Amino acid sequence: MIKVRFAPSPTGYIHIGNIRIALFNWLYAQAHNGTFILRYDNTDVERSKQEYIDAIAVDLEWLGIQPDEIYYQSKRFNRYDEVAEILKQRGLLYPCYETAEELDRRRKIQLSRKLPPVYDRAALKLTPEKKREFETQGRKPHWRFLLPNFENDPLQKKRTEVCWNDAVKGKQTIDLASLSDPVLIREDGSYLYTLPSVVDDIDMAITHIIRGDDHITNTGAQIALFEALNAKLPTFGHINLLTTLLGKGLSKRNNDLSIHSLRADGFESIAVQCLAVLIGTSQNVHPYPNQAVLLEHFNLQDTSRSVAKFDIADLLTLNSHFVHELTYEEVKKRLENLSINGEKVECFWNAIRSNINKVNDAVLWWKMLHDEQNFDTVALEDRAFVRQSLNLLPEGTLNEESWKVWTVALKEKTGRRGKALFMPLRQALTGMDHGPEMGKILQLLGREKVIERLIIQGE
């Protein structure tokens, strides 16, 4: 049975790049009747926050992702300690006492000599006396995993290829001799990503690990750790990364691209899903109506080899497709939450929806119709025409037909036509050069407000 996982770190709001990984895993599980696990990577107890755990849960629910199982790494420290002890007893996890400054100095020396900045396993040469001396000085060891890239002497590395058939990129090869032994445990005893992740993947019987291709190099070391623990290897699949237009990686520090902020800004869930899943693939980004249809077009092998660049303008364009199709009943509650209510709200929505990119944009049009306006958009040469238009405004309650009657009368009286006829009236009544049909604007403003604005803008 297919079993995948999404393992976010709750140290901030997750962004569209994170959720892209979640959606790939979720859709893959759905396509194969598999199981989707949500695993919170919260071993960093200082930076992990409950508010972000809660936010991730809300984000996933908003995107239609329903985890089958939920785990917290912070509740599994005893298990990680147990595995770490096994590795120590087998000599596969060894203590190192170098400070960060010492390691940095070694890397700089290696680079100056045009050598790869790979850890030289100097800690393996330490005598028990030297270790005690470091301990007496107050140094605490960090612990490295001994990669199997040697025959008998770990100080004599040899080329050791680790190969796997990547579900996205095909055959991949990593030479373990080109890697530093990964640090699994920090000086303070806390765990870095690798050991808890591998132990969890083993214990939870994860069959497929689908993640960003920035993890490809890590995969070589992780495969070595899987094998050291006599575990069955999962299938790895590495998808291209999502970057900014400038090619920079997405960060939790950039809150503008967090799912939390995109949702608050009024983006549609399905728009975010379609862009996240289809960008950076051989498919066009298409506004599929729901997740079920998106699933029909999802194919892991369609992923491109090059990075995918995220442009908020693309998301806005895609979002507008969905907004223009939303009925009043579908947005009624959301409009109420935006303080848009009253007798004409349904008429208002039907008038403006094709002119907005997000539901939240309705607020701008609502304020334009109901608030006192101080816009000054009518050209001086058009103000006499605006004053004249007031005299030809149809009598009675204004409706959509009133616009046609009004403009025909103005055309006959003034000889104006086209833009010269319509634009000054639109500017006088809305302060804008574009927008909904003017017949609907007249109906929404009402006779009293139309007269008031024509008087002000004609002065």
Swiss-Prot record:
Catalytic activity, reaction form: tRNA(Glu) + L-glutamate + ATP = L-glutamyl-tRNA(Glu) + AMP + diphosphate
PROSITE patterns from the UniProt entry: AA_TRNA_LIGASE_I
Annotated motif 'HIGH' region, positions: 8-18
Pfam families recorded: Anticodon_2, tRNA-synt_1c
UniProt-listed Enzyme Commission number(s): 6.1.1.17
Quaternary structure and partners: Monomer.
Full protein name: Glutamate--tRNA ligase 2
Source organism: Bartonella henselae (strain ATCC 49882 / DSM 28221 / CCUG 30454 / Houston 1)
Classification of source organism: Bacteria, Pseudomonadati, Pseudomonadota, Alphaproteobacteria, Hyphomicrobiales
Gene: gltX2
